[in-house]
Amino acid sequence: MSRVTLSRYLIEQTRSHNTPADLRFLIEVVARACKEISHAVSKGALGGVLGSMGTENVQGEVQKKLDVMSNEILLEANEWAGNLAGMASEEMDHPYQIPGRYPKGAYLLVFDPLDGSSNIDVNVSVGTIFSVLRCPNEYLNQNDTLREEAFLQPGTTQVAAGYAIYGPQTMLMLTLGNGVKGFTLDRELGSFVLTHDNISVPESTAEFAINMSNQRHWEAPVKRYVEELLAGKEGPLGKNYNMRWIASMVADVHRILTRGGVFMYPRDAREPEKPGKLRLMYEANPMSFIIEQAGGAATNGTQRILDIKPENLHQRVAVFLGSKQEVERITGYHKE
């Protein structure tokens, strides 16, 4: 039986689900950029790409060389293709304007070019997260500068989302709003090949992912929930749980997507003015879309993440996502 490449899958989606051709082309361009990033990541010290740039991004985080390189790869791959009205990235303060010499399209691309990059130097899996939105009609004027407001849409408006994970294999996880598919990069063929069909997150779990070193800074509902997990079979939940924490959202969520579990990045009392650590537009929204499409759930503790109306491009949010039963339990604790 012939293998299904990403290109073939997208063509079949156009035929069976009326996926627009320009969206198909956009996903293929993003996938090609991810292959290039994967190649750069795999070289490590041999490619001279480890270490920091000595600069900070808009969040005040030190930029790694690969952060900047990955950002440039995604911008250059997508700016000329004619599918996008604009782009936004974790590494840029403001939206990226499509150069006037290129045609513009109907979509917006938002991305974290290299999630988990603080782990690069220690050879831990990292990845690229992306979200695709439709550009509102009022912002489609070819001559106008695209404003940030065009991007400020709730996650429910996403038309596609995905992430590439650069680990022992390079994989692309993708949703077009009708389930989640997983593609593995065949390095000899040079193509992403469908290897995981109709991915589903188990409703209950025996694993959780959270940075326990911050426990003293959590809100009471999170402390209560984690204490119940740690109580094991003798506790109120009646079973033993294992904890996993990689400190790379892509890697942690990928494990939960394929094995089940709950990922938590709660608010922190050390920064009470911030509603969370992770960014809504290009981390929480695409991951929540993927998790929900796989049968899981995602909230900020009190509200479904995909229902949140963004107020700014780099807005932060608390995140609880994964197996539906566990996410509903901790969300219930927040509402008590």
UniProtKB/Swiss-Prot annotation:
Reaction it catalyzes: beta-D-fructose 1,6-bisphosphate + H2O = beta-D-fructose 6-phosphate + phosphate
InterPro entries, alphabetized: FBPase_C_dom, FBPase_class-1, FBPase_N, FBPtase
One protein family per Pfam: FBPase
Enzyme Commission code(s) on record: 3.1.3.11
GO-annotated cellular components: cytosol
Amino-acid positions noted as binding Mg(2+) 2 in the UniProt annotation, renumbered to this chain: D112, D115, E283
Any single GO BP term: fructose 1,6-bisphosphate metabolic process
Main location: cytoplasm
Single GO term (MF): fructose 1,6-bisphosphate 1-phosphatase activity
Cofactor note: Binds 2 magnesium ions per subunit.
Enzyme class: hydrolase
Superkingdom: Bacteria
Pathway: Carbohydrate biosynthesis; gluconeogenesis
Keyword Magnesium attributed: yes
Annotated compartments: Cytoplasm
Cofactor dependency: Mg(2+)
CDD domains documented for this protein: FBPase (cd00354)
Gene3D superfamilies: 3.40.190.80, Fructose-1,6-Bisphosphatase, subunit A, domain 1
Record key words, sorted: Carbohydrate metabolism, Cytoplasm, Hydrolase, Magnesium, Metal-binding
Residue numbers binding Mg(2+) 1: E90, D112, L114
Family annotation (NCBIfam families): PRK09293.1-1 (NF006778), PRK09293.1-3 (NF006779), PRK09293.1-4 (NF006780)
Family, as annotated: Belongs to the FBPase class 1 family.
Classification via PANTHER family: FRUCTOSE-1,6-BISPHOSPHATASE-RELATED, SEDOHEPTULOSE-1,7-BISPHOSPHATASE, CHLOROPLASTIC
Subunit structure: Homotetramer.
Protein name: Fructose-1,6-bisphosphatase class 1
Gene name in the database record: fbp
